[in-house]
A protein has these predicted regions:
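RecB-family 4Fe-4S metal-dependent nuclease core
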Residues: 1-143
């Protein structure tokens, strides 16, 4: 796994992680769909910020470039300093916020354990953002 955090805004020991998206509507990035769509990028970035920078993760959002969509993701409902540019259903109470971060960490640990155990199953529907295998000549996945 690899990734690059686009932006981290900090204030008073807290951090808001921002991931810019181009060409996509970010409504599909609402926190309510993260588990169903196995979408843990922003949560993982928040964990990295906590661990490496020693800051409290106060939110992780996907921001559209060149569109007027509202940022989507998750923000801590107890942090007013983030402003009001977020949908109410992306604001989570502290225990739910932490549970999403724990879920993301569990996903990464589970993937790591499977890879270390030699399990490299193919899943063409999840392979590329629009479905379909990215490397059909080497994938060996049977249709």
């Amino acid at each position: 796994m690899r990734g690059r955090i686009d932006r981290v805004d900090t204030s008073d020991g807290m951090a808001l992680v921002i991931d810019y998206k181009s060409g996509k509507r970010v409504d599909s990035y609402k926190v309510g769909s993260w588990e169903a769509e196995n979408r843990f990028q922003a949560a993982l970035y928040m964990l990295v910020v906590e661990r490496l920078l020693g800051l409290r993760a106060a939110g992780g959002v996907y921001v559209p470039l060149g569109k007027s969509d509202t940022p989507r993701g998750m923000v801590a409902e107890d942090v007013d300093e983030l402003g009001s540019d977020f949908k109410d259903n992306d604001r989570l109470p502290p225990e739910e916020f932490r549970a999403k971060l724990d879920w993301a960490l569990g996903q990464v640990r589970d993937a790591d354990a499977r890879m270390r155990g030699g399990e490299l199953g193919c899943d063409p529907d999840q392979c590329a953002w629009n479905g379909g295998c990215m490397y059909p000549s080497i994938c060996r996945c049977e249709s």
